[in-house]
A protein has these predicted regions:
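Intrinsically disordered, low-complexity activation-like regions
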Residues: 2-134
Length: 134
């Protein structure tokens, strides 16, 4: 999945709107590979930076193969996309921190038949952690 994800970003990155980006980005955020977590972090902030600090500005999505049926479009207001990306940032950071700390998502241990370490158990018992999926 991650190979297809990378290929897709390489080929279609400039054509993705914020919602499409978030869908395509999910494999990066949910992998237990620190390398791909970091790649995802880079992809995320590159996408967020497209919006800058003024989410109401116009953004062009260029289609390299403009035809009468598939043309480039101008998005004149994408405040909701920007807000959605902003709301995902804490989740991105949380997923990355878990992988940096444990090298895996401890909450997956039972489903994957893995034994939890004492530090993972302590982490999972934290009231704050129990409220989130990672």
């Amino acid at each position: 999945v991650l190979i297809f994800c990378e290929l897709g970003f390489e080929l279609y990155r400039d054509q993705l709107n914020g919602y499409e980006f978030m869908f395509a980005f999910m494999p990066y955020m949910h992998t237990e590979s620190l390398l791909y977590q970091r790649k995802g972090e880079t992809q995320f902030f590159n996408q967020k930076n497209l919006y800058g600090t003024n989410p109401g500005k116009t953004k062009s999505l260029r289609n390299p193969n403009d035809t009468p049926f598939m043309t480039s479009i101008e998005l004149t207001n994408y405040d909701k996309e920007y807000e959605m990306l902003k709301s995902m940032e804490p989740h991105l950071k949380g997923h990355l921190e878990v992988i940096q700390g444990f090298g895996r998502f401890p909450k997956r241990n039972v489903a994957l038949g893995r034994e939890s370490t004492s530090s993972e158990i302590k982490y999972m018992e934290s009231p704050e952690v129990q409220k989130r999926p990672y």
